[in-house]
Regions:
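N-terminal regions that are enriched for targeting/export leaders
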Residues: 2-58
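Bimodal feature
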Residues: 2-22, 72-75, 88, 405-406, ...
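Active-site nucleophile-adjacent alpha helix/oxyanion-hole segment immediately C-terminal to the catalytic cysteine
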Residues: 44-314, 391-394, 401, 409
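Catalytic nucleophile-His microenvironment captured as a short glycine-rich beta-strand/loop
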Residues: 69, 148, 355-388
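Short His-Asn-centered micro-motif
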Residues: 72, 316-319, 368
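Long, positively charged binding patches that form subdomain-scale interaction surfaces
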Residues: 287-362
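Active/binding-pocket-proximal capping segment
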Residues: 320-326, 330-348, 371-374, 381-391, ...
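Conserved catalytic-core surface of thiol
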Residues: 373-443
Length: 443
C-alpha cells in the first residue's frame, strides 16, 4: 500500500502554482461557489422553453420537504386529464392521502419481510438492508399503482396537507424507530418458537400502534366524502357520499394495467429486451411485483415521444441532481464546464456510472412536451417538476436530449406503443435483481 509522502505533495503544490488558470478559478469559486462559477451561458442559449409538442401549462404542485415525487408525478398525470375532462380552472388530487396509505402498507410490508427473514442472522446482508431503512418516502410506479387500485384517490380539499406530509423527516425518523423495535419483537417471538397465529396477532397489535401514529401525524383518511365544483362554464356540480375508489373510477378512470415501466440500464448484467424485478421492493403485500422492460435509449425515447404525440404526458424517473441547475430549471450535459475551469473531465459513460455507484434514479417527474427537429428527432424535453413555481419556468424544467440519454432511467407508457415482441418480453418471467441493485432505487 502506497503512502503519501511530503515530496510527492510538494510536487502537487508546485504544479498547482504553475497553473495560472487554476488560481483564477480559485478566486472565482471562493467568492461565488463551485457550480455558479462553472455555469455556462451556452446551456441557457441551447435550452429555451419553446417546444414543438407542449401538452400543458397547468400550475405546478409542490412536494415541499418530502420525498413524494413519485406520487406527485403520478397524480399530476391524472390531474391534467381531470382538468381537461371536467373543464376545471385548476385542481389537485390529495398527495397526503396516497402518502398515508403508502406508509401504512410499507409498514406491513416491512414486518412481513422481517418475518420471512427471521431464520437469517441479524447481521446478514438482507436483514441489514431491511433494518437500514424500514421505510422511506420514495417509491416506484408499480407501487403507486397498487395504492391507487386499493385505496383510490381524493381531492386535495378533502384531505389536505399536514406539517408531517409536507416536511416528513420527523415522521420518518420515529416511524422507522418504531418499526425497528417491532422487528426485534417479532424476531424474538419467532426465536422462541411462536406459532404463525401468535405472530399474526402480535403483528396486528403493532399495526394498530402504527396506524395511530400515522393518523395523529396525517389525519384519518376519509372513507367517503362530498365533492362539489364549478366548471369553466360556471356550471355547478356535486357528488355526495363518494368513496375514494369511486372517485378514481369516475374522475380519473384510467386502467392502470394498460401501462408498463420501461427502463434504460445499459450495464452488462441487464441485457436489453428482457424484463426485471427487484427483490424486497414493494409496498402492498399481494400486489403485482415491480416489473421493468429494459430497452436501448433510442427506443426508450421513441416510446416517450409516441405517447406525447398521442396527447398524454409521461411519468419518468431520472438522476435529477446531475448537471442540472435547480433555479433556472435547465438540465443539460453542458450546464457546467469543469474542463475549462478545473481541467477535470468526467468521462464515465452511463453504464460506468451505474456500476460504480455514481448515478441512479433519484427523482420522478412528468414529461409534458418535446421539441422535435425537421427529422422528428428530439432536441429538448419539457419537464413538469413538483418543486413549486419559484424554480425553472414557473415550475417547469427543460432537459436537453443528451441529458435525457445520460441521466434518465425510466418511463411509463401505454402497452399499445410496444411491439408484440416487446410486450412478450415484458410479460416473460423477470430476472430478479438484488435489493441493492441501482434499478431498485426509489424515486
Amino acid at each position: 500500500m502506497s503512502t503519501l509522502d511530503f515530496d510527492f505533495t510538494e510536487r502537487l503544490y508546485a504544479n498547482y502554482l504553475a497553473n495560472p488558470s487554476l488560481q483564477a478559478t480559485e478566486n472565482t469559486v471562493s467568492h461565488n461557489g463551485l457550480l455558479k462559477s462553472l455555469e455556462t451561458r451556452q446551456s441557457a442559449i441551447d435550452n429555451d422553453y419553446v417546444f414543438s409538442i407542449d401538452l400543458t401549462k397547468d400550475a405546478v404542485s409542490n412536494q415541499k420537504a418530502s420525498g413524494r415525487c413519485w406520487m406527485f408525478a403520478a397524480l399530476n398525470t391524472f390531474r391534467h386529464k381531470l382538468i381537461s375532462d371536467f373543464k376545471l380552472e385548476n385542481f389537485e388530487l390529495s398527495q397526503a392521502h396516497t402518502f398515508f396509505w403508502d406508509k401504512y402498507e410499507k409498514s406491513n410490508w416491512f414486518l412481513e419481510q422481517i418475518i420471512a427473514t427471521a431464520d437469517q442472522e441479524i447481521g446478514s446482508r438482507k436483514v441489514k438492508f431491511l433494518l437500514d431503512t424500514p421505510q422511506q418516502d420514495g417509491g416506484q410506479w408499480d407501487m403507486v399503482v397498487a395504492l391507487f387500485e386499493k385505496y383510490g384517490v381524493v381531492p386535495k380539499s378533502v384531505y389536505p396537507e399536514s406539517i408531517s406530509s409536507s416536511a416528513s423527516r420527523e415522521l420518518n425518523q420515529y416511524l422507522n424507530k418504531l418499526l425497528r423495535q417491532d422487528a426485534q419483537i417479532l424476531r424474538d417471538l419467532l426465536a422462541k418458537g411462536a406459532s404463525s397465529e401468535e405472530v399474526q396477532v402480535q403483528k396486528e397489535n403493532l399495526l394498530q400502534e402504527i396506524f395511530n401514529f400515522l393518523a395523529v401525524n396525517l389525519g384519518l383518511p376519509p372513507r367517503s366524502f362530498d365533492f362539489a365544483y364549478r366548471d369553466k362554464d360556471n356550471v355547478y356540480h356535486r357528488d355526495t357520499n363518494v368513496t375514494p375508489q369511486a372517485f378514481y373510477e369516475k374522475y380519473v378512470g384510467l386502467k392502470l394495467s394498460d401501462y408498463v415501466s420501461i427502463i434504460n440500464a445499459p450495464t452488462t448484467d441487464k441485457p436489453y429486451n428482457k424484463s426485471y424485478t427487484v427483490e424486497l421492493l414493494g409496498n402492498v403485500v399481494g400486489a403485482p411485483a415491480v416489473r421493468y422492460l429494459n430497452v436501448e435509449m433510442n427506443r426508450f425515447k421513441e416510446l416517450a415521444i409516441a405517447q406525447l404525440k398521442a396527447g398524454e404526458s409521461v411519468w419518468f424517473g431520472s438522476d435529477v441532481g446531475q448537471s442540472s441547475n435547480r433555479q433556472t430549471g435547465i438540465m443539460a450535459t453542458n450546464t457546467y464546464d469543469f474542463s475549462s475551469g478545473l481541467g477535470i473531465h468526467f468521462h464515465q459513460d452511463k453504464a460506468g456510472r451505474l456500476d460504480y455507484s455514481e448515478s441512479l434514479m433519484t427523482h420522478a417527474m412528468v414529461l409534458t412536451g418535446v421539441d422535435l427537429d425537421d427529422n422528428e428527432q428530439p432536441l429538448k424535453w419539457k419537464v413538469e417538476n413538483s418543486w413549486g413555481d419559484k424554480v425553472g419556468d414557473k415550475g417547469y424544467f427543460v432537459a436537453s436530449d443528451s441529458w435525457m440519454d445520460e441521466y434518465t432511467y425510466q418511463i411509463v407508457v401505454r402497452k399499445e406503443f410496444l411491439t408484440p415482441e416487446e410486450l412478450a418480453a415484458y410479460q416473460a418471467q423477470p430476472q430478479i435483481l438484488a435489493p441493492w441493485d441501482p434499478m431498485g432505487a426509489l424515486a
